[in-house]
Amino acid sequence: DLVREQLRIAMGEPLGFTQDGVSMRGHAIECRVYAEDVSHGFLPDPGPILRHRTPAGPGVRVDAGVLEGGRVEVHYDPMISKLIVSADTRESAIARMIRAIETYEIIGVSTTLPFGHFVMNHPVFRSGQYNTHFVEHFAGEMSPPDDHVPPSAIAAGVVWRAAERARRSQDGPERIARQAHRPTDGA
């Protein structure tokens, strides 16, 4: 267990295993999904999460920190989730990640999912010959976002807006109790 090993190290103890006990098998890829606007320099895009449907299936895991109906707040890290895939080969893991990104639905905020899709499909990434300057060198090749808004997104926005208005009208504005005006003696 990773947490147990972290606690052991924190207490000054050695790891409970050696490198000889670690075997490599398969490949795993993680894409961090942020509420960020890739087309504007990865600026945070806070707002409501109107729809959040995560991909599923063998070798696909999503560790989400935001739920549908929640909000990405301006004062916190805009991470929505970690999307992790694993497969027997690197090529299979990349293909699985592409499918996972394509089936991941988030409506309400811009996300880094299109950027993850761009990276997974880029020939330099696929070749394995990339470095930490990938974004700097290749982000300009990414197509601008599609401004077409699917009808389901429009419908989700309309429903959310109606629900917000209904909630506000039920709560009503705070009212200040008025005291009856009473004249004072001698005034």
Tell what function each PLM region has.
Residues 1-187:
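Catalytic cores of soluble metabolic enzymes centered on carboxylation/carboxyl-transfer
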